[in-house]
Structures are given as C-alpha cells and as structure tokens.
Amino acid sequence: MKTMKKYIKTAFFCSMYWLIVQLNIANLGTRIPDKYFRQKYIIFKSFNFEKHGKFWNKWFYVRKWKHKILDGHQLNQNIYDQRHLMTINTDEIEKMIIETKRAELIHWISILPVIIFNKGPRLVKYINIFYAMIANVPIIIVQRYNRPRLTQLLRILKRKGERHD
C-alpha cells in the first residue's frame, strides 16, 4: 500500500511538472516575434529525405490522424487559431508557415525538460521519456508534413500574383 501511495504521489508531481513546464514553454514561444521565424534556419528546412512532406505521410500516415491532435489554441489563446482562416491568400499562408515553425520549435524545446528525470528511478525516467516523446513528436511530424505543402501553395499564389483577396 505504501508503494502504491508513493507511485500515485510521483505520478501526480510528474503530471504537475509537465503541465506547468509545457504551458510556460508554449506561452514563451508565442511571444517570440514573427520576424525570427521568417528567416531560413536549417532546423526548419525541409530535407531531401522528407520529399516535401511525403515521407511523413508514407511512414506515419499523417493524413489519417493529424486532425485528431488537439489544437493548441484551445489551451493557450496566444496560439494561432487556424480555424479563423477565412481566405487563402499569401498573407495568411505566410502566417501559417510561421506558426508551423513556432509550433515545431516549441515542441522540440518541450522535450528537453525530461532531463530532470535523468537521476530518478528507472521506471519514472522511462515513463517520462515516453510521455515527452508521445506528447511532442507527433506535433513535430505534423509541422514537418504541413510546412512544405504550405510553402508550395505560397509559391503558387505568388506566381499567380494573388497578394490579397
């Protein structure tokens, strides 16, 4: 009984830790000015093996499950709400590309706090590593899948000269 109580207490504190840390990372991430995401950093580059996002769908079937991921705007009002996308124009697509970069960065950073569990008991460490991966990697994959497709759409719109609707 004492061991069970200890596990429940540990689970509670780990849950609170992740909730507080991830909400704070997301909140700080939304404060990064857009200008930093307009630059071409290598981390956001679509690599050759990704084949403009096709890799992610071929190996992870992204199209089948990406719509099931909770929209970050529901937890943090500062996160871009893509449901308000009324028109498809270059300004909106550029904003969506910026937000895919922001989301990817936030979720990469959100994995790092798992380091705190490095010295903890093996079970606690493995559960928290699993949680950090399962909570963040799917969102990173979706961003890496969507961004090249949005970039291609932006190129097409710019070629057609559609600046505003």
From Swiss-Prot:
Which EC number(s) does UniProt give? 2.3.1.-
Task: Recite the UniProt keywords alphabetically.
Answer: Acyltransferase, Carotenoid biosynthesis, Cell membrane, Membrane, Signal, Transferase, Transmembrane, Transmembrane helix
| MF (Gene Ontology) | acyltransferase activity
User: Which top-rank group of organisms is this from?
Assistant: Bacteria
Task: Specify the enzyme's EC class, one word.
Answer: transferase
What span is annotated as the signal peptide, if there is one? 1-28
Pathway assigned to this chain's UniProt record: Carotenoid biosynthesis; staphyloxanthin biosynthesis; staphyloxanthin from farnesyl diphosphate: step 5/5
Annotated compartments: Cell membrane
Q: Which InterPro entries match?
A: CrtO
Q: Tell me which family the UniProt entry assigns to this protein.
A: Belongs to the acyltransferase CrtO family.
Q: What is this protein called?
A: Glycosyl-4,4'-diaponeurosporenoate acyltransferase
Q: Which organism is it from?
A: Staphylococcus aureus (strain Newman)
Lineage, highest ranks first:
Bacteria, Bacillati, Bacillota, Bacilli, Bacillales
